[in-house]
């Protein structure tokens, strides 16, 4: 039976789904087209749900993945992938190849070919005859991490349609999370849990764990990390799924074996099959911090199990209990490990001799501890961005402190000249218009004869320039007429040079004009500045106009 004749796929472009190749379209359009088709099929799943005894049953769609390096085949689908690739290269034989492959997929994945008593045959038939997606299917991913995740899931049992949708959703949004399982030593007398070095006993780490909460609802209310001791649950209400692919081992670590370790946290472990909602309910009653599922759904009931799980688990549980999903292959391995760690004696478990040698002959039990991290694989990028932003902040703070120190030095210079900082800020505000000194005001400013600097005695009392008084003597006005002159006593500061031209007062240029703030300049330097530029003193930035007006008011 051709895959395109299936009632579930009659509305899809079979070339896009089956071969992953349409010769006349570019890669981006092919990828979007395939994703949209699968989403449409998933949204209409309830419409096409059929009883198991119908003559036409939903055909499982399985996906294998080929690495970005052309010619590298992943998982157990190498044989089928190579045949699909040959059909991809030979356009003339594409139609006949697709028909023969689709017939093999339909016959091998038929629910009747599965046997409840033979799990291994079910696994082999579920992973064979998978539909190949070529290396141009995920060209947007430069990292091999999502590619490896798809390969691991497809080759280990998560290759049915319902499960593939979850994996593809995780690939599209990069929502794979790290899972770590280590050996813990629980001391019976103090009930203390201590971690072991991973080279001493059992250790497992995978970055390909999927959280079902992210697919069905939201992870916004969940914590970042979930830690606890793993134990196997029994489904609530004695639920039994006869089509489940789980393997019953002789022994395991049950809730009764870890019930006294609740303070360390508990992680439930269960197969994901039709009874998965009952396992969730039991985990809630056990007050577990999270539940770790491994896929145990067959091709015939995979879609039903995932629909049933979404309908049976309430929203509050989705938002409060983390539910992780790992592959069938890893789940069966953990089943066996739990069996080996079910012994109550430390030296009776796996690598017991090494544990006794490491810890000594102590009264303790070996258990498996689980750590599920919510942080995605981009955590390293987030850390790099955080460090970069922190470095930029430190550099910005250093620059601010540097300029702040420079401004403080400038303010100290103003204070040394007796100028209040607040007055200076108000006078040079950015919105304050510049005033100029008129010719009449300029003529009122005296021009004096510089009589030479006087050095101060270290024992003299310090007096600021604004406090000194003029001793009347010879001086000149703006027209060169002799008026009065003044000499500053040895106890007062003095200016030895004009701060505009930076030339010292000497016998060649002894004249200076004195502003009301007692700063002096050469008349040839200060007069054009006051008449054309501003009435602010070049040194203290005080307004000459305001100072003259205040002086006239004081005289009145």
UniProtKB/Swiss-Prot annotation:
InterPro entries: RING_finger_E3_ligase, Znf_RING, Znf_RING/FYVE/PHD. It comes from the Eukaryota. Residues 69-129 are annotated as: Disordered. The keyword RNA-binding does not apply. Pfam families: zf-RING_2. One of its GO terms (molecular function) is ubiquitin protein ligase activity. Residues 74-85, 93-129 have a biased composition (Low complexity). One of its GO terms (cellular component) is cytoplasm. The chain crosses the membrane at residues 379-399. GO terms for biological process: ubiquitin-dependent protein catabolic process. This is Uncharacterized RING finger membrane protein C15C4.06c. It comes from Schizosaccharomyces pombe (strain 972 / ATCC 24843) (Fission yeast).
């Amino acid at each position: 039976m051709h895959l395109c004749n299936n009632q579930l796929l009659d509305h899809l472009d079979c070339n896009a789904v089956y071969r992953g190749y349409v010769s006349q379209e570019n890669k981006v359009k092919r990828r979007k087209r395939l994703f949209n088709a699968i989403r449409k099929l998933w949204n209409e799943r309830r419409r096409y749900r059929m009883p198991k005894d119908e003559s036409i049953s939903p055909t499982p769609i399985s996906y294998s993945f080929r690495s970005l390096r052309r010619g590298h085949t992943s998982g157990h689908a190498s044989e089928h992938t190579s045949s699909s690739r040959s059909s991809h290269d030979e356009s003339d034989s594409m139609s006949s190849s697709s028909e023969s492959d689709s017939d093999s997929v339909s016959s091998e994945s038929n629910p009747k070919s599965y046997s409840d008593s033979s799990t291994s045959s079910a696994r082999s038939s579920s992973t064979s005859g998978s539909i190949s997606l070529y290396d141009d299917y995920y060209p947007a991913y430069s990292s091999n991490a999502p590619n490896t995740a798809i390969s691991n899931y497809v080759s280990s049992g998560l290759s049915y349609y319902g499960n593939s949708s979850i994996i593809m959703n995780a690939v599209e949004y990069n929502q794979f999370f790290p899972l770590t399982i280590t050996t813990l030593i629980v001391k019976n007398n103090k009930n203390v849990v201590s971690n072991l070095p991973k080279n001493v006993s059992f250790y497992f780490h995978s970055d390909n764990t999927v959280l079902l909460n992210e697919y069905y609802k939201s992870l916004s209310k969940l914590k970042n990390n979930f830690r606890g001791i793993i134990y196997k649950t029994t489904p609530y209400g004695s639920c039994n799924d006869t089509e489940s692919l789980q393997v019953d081992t002789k022994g395991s670590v049950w809730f009764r074996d870890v019930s006294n370790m609740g303070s360390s946290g508990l992680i439930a472990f269960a197969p994901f099959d039709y009874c998965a909602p009952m396992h969730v309910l039991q985990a809630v009653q056990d007050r577990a911090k999270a539940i770790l599922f491994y896929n145990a759904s067959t091709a015939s009931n995979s879609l039903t199990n995932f629909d049933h799980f979404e309908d049976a688990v309430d929203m509050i549980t989705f938002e409060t209990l983390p539910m992780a999903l790992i592959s069938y292959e890893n789940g069966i391995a953990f089943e066996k490990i739990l069996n080996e760690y079910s012994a109550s004696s430390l030296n009776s478990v796996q690598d017991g001799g090494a544990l006794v040698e490491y810890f000594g002959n102590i009264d303790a039990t070996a258990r498996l501890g689980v750590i599920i991290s919510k942080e995605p694989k981009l955590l390293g990028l987030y850390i790099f961005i955080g460090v970069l932003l922190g470095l930029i902040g430190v550099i910005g703070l250093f620059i601010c402190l540097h300029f702040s120190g420079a401004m403080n030095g400038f303010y100290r210079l103003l204070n040394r000249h007796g100028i209040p900082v607040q007055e200076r800020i108000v006078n040079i505000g950015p919105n304050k218009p510049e005033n100029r000194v008129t010719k009449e005001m300029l003529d009122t400013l005296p021009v004096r004869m510089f009589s030479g600097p006087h050095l101060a005695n270290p024992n003299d009392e310090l007096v600021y320039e604004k406090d000194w008084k003029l001793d009347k003597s010879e001086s000149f006005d703006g027209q060169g007429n002799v008026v009065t002159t003044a000499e500053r006593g040895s106890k007062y500061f003095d200016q030895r040079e004009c701060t505009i031209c930076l030339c010292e007062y000497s016998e060649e240029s002894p004249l200076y004009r004195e502003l009301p703030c007692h700063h002096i300049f050469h008349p040839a330097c200060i007069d054009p500045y006051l008449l054309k530029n501003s009435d602010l003193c070049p040194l203290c930035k005080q307004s000459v106009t305001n100072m003259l007006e205040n002086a006239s008011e004081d005289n009145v």
